[in-house]
Amino acid sequence: MDWKKLQDLLSGVNQYSTAFGRIWLSVVFVFRVLVYVVAAERVWGDEQKDFDCNTRQPGCTNVCYDNFFPISNIRLWALQLIFVTCPSMLVILHVAYREERERKHRQKHGEQCAKLYSHPGKKHGGLWWTYLFSLIFKLIIELVFLYVLHTLWHGFTMPRLVQCASIVPCPNTVDCYIARPTEKKVFTYFMVGASAVCIILTICEICYLIFHRIMRGISKGKSTKSISSPKSSSRASTCRCHHKLLESGDPEADPASEKLQASAPSLTPI
């Protein structure tokens, strides 16, 4: 697996992320990818080779190993890291789509035309939803993999001894011993803890995005009200003045004066 390419891709997401997203990316690379590459692969490298059983029955050791380890921890973590980082690619693709659309718009209408997007990487409109859905996908993937890890091995511990009973071709109950069980247990706890930290950071980032969106909507509503309030007050004052003028007029006006006003020419100032 080429981790350098994965790092380069995710570094592109970093410029569009919030503070929580940058911390999440640091945790993924420092506490998960580096530990996986440097240490965990070596600890689990001899997993099947040093899985020792007290039987000489051909095929029994392999069957017992497959029964207890349907999928190796190290491969499950590799899949988890790949699937967890994939939703971040949605953000990069969406930004690339915006930039391409902006480029075509400028080619068609010229460089002096108005921009479609003031900033293609700003989390507004559809990009905000893309970013939010990518966080939700990451959260679901983390929880699913933790559940799978806990279910397959009945917890996060690594026993020293496992027993295979009534499994063909093993003749009877066979005792098998796992290599480096304590070391594997420590790494399992460490990776589960790092995954839990990533889950907490993702939840915090989702809450931050929603809260920021709500506050921005409230501030927009207040600014709209402040702009529209002078117009409404001027209209109200005009109506009040007009009402006072009507009230100040004599309802019982002299009919003669009304006739004189009607016969007088209407003079308009030039």
From Swiss-Prot:
Major place of residence: membrane
Highest rank taxon of the organism: Eukaryota
Membrane topology, Extracellular segments: 41-75, 150-188
Membrane topology annotation: Multi-pass membrane protein
One example of a Gene Ontology biological process annotation: cell communication
UniProt entry keywords in alphabetical sequence: Cell junction, Cell membrane, Gap junction, Membrane, Transmembrane, Transmembrane helix
Gene3D superfamilies: Gap junction channel protein cysteine-rich domain (1.20.1440.80)
Function in brief: One gap junction consists of a cluster of closely packed pairs of transmembrane channels, the connexons, through which materials of low MW diffuse from one cell to a neighboring cell.
Family that this chain belongs to: Belongs to the connexin family. Beta-type (group I) subfamily.
Self-association and partners: A connexon is composed of a hexamer of connexins. Interacts with CNST.
Record's protein name: Gap junction beta-3 protein
Organism: Mus musculus (Mouse)
Taxonomic classification: Eukaryota, Metazoa, Chordata, Craniata, Vertebrata
